[in-house]
């Protein structure tokens, strides 16, 4: 909770002035109920990255239900996935279920892959259509796990970047990018 976080910050840092804000898809109602300011997620992350990592050129964020790429230079430009959760945390969770694991298990499996298979990344329904025959044919789970992460990376590059190069210092944000296998595929 916020109070626990503030106490922990106080215990570690002592007296300091804080200005907590709430962001995210469900944040506006929560901010109103708690009487805490709300800030748009893309503004919050862009300001934080600009302050902490001024050398950053691109931000790639994979959330639970959406994905964004923000080009910071030469002028800010943000792109977000459309109406489908393809290439997001929800997509990863859905695909992990098909392999009888969770996102962390998918990550562990992917580290041992040998072969990559093409899997649709735009939509979970299409990806499942690609994945199920591979499962039925006995494809190795590590190969399928890495193929799922490759589909996520492909969706980010093809769908969000849409031909614009991703170069320079890239900052990865979001829970799905916690998984090393996915981060390495993006690099």
Name each model-derived stretch.
Residues 6-18, 156-168:
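Phosphate/pyrophosphate-binding loops at sites that engage ATP/ADP/AMP, CoA/4′-phosphopantetheine
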Residues 10-43, 70-79:
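Short beta-strand-loop/turn "lid" adjacent to the catalytic site in phosphate-handling enzymes
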Residues 23-26, 168-178:
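Glycine-rich beta-strand-to-loop/alpha-helix junction loops that act as flexible
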Residues 56-73:
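Gly/Thr-rich phosphate-binding beta-strand-loop-beta motif of the actin/hexokinase/Hsp70
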Residues 74-115:
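Glycine-rich phosphate-binding loop plus the immediately following alpha-helix
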Residues 127-160:
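Adenine-nucleotide phosphate-binding core of ATP-dependent small-molecule kinases
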Residues 185-187:
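Conserved small/polar residues in nucleotide/adenosyl-binding loops
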């Amino acid at each position: 909770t916020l109070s626990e976080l503030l106490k922990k910050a106080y215990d570690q840092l002592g007296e300091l002035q804080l200005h907590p804000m709430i962001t995210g898809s469900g944040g506006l109602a929560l901010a109103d109920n708690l009487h805490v300011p709300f800030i748009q997620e893309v503004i919050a992350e862009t300001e934080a990255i600009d302050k902490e990592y001024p050398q950053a050129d691109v931000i790639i964020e994979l959330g639970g239900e959406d994905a964004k790429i923000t080009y910071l230079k030469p002028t800010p430009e943000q792109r977000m996935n459309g109406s489908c959760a393809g290439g997001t945390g929800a997509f990863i969770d859905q695909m992990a279920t098909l392999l009888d694991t969770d996102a962390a298990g998918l990550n562990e499996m992917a580290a041992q892959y040998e072969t990559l298979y093409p899997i649709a990344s735009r939509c979970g329904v299409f990806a499942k259509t690609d994945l199920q025959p591979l499962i039925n044919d006995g494809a190795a789970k590590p190969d399928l796990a890495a193929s799922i992460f490759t589909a996520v990376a492909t969706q980010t590059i093809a769908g969000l970047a849409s031909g614009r190069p991703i170069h320079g210092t890239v900052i990865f944000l979001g829970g799905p990018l916690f998984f090393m296998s996915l981060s390495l595929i993006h690099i």
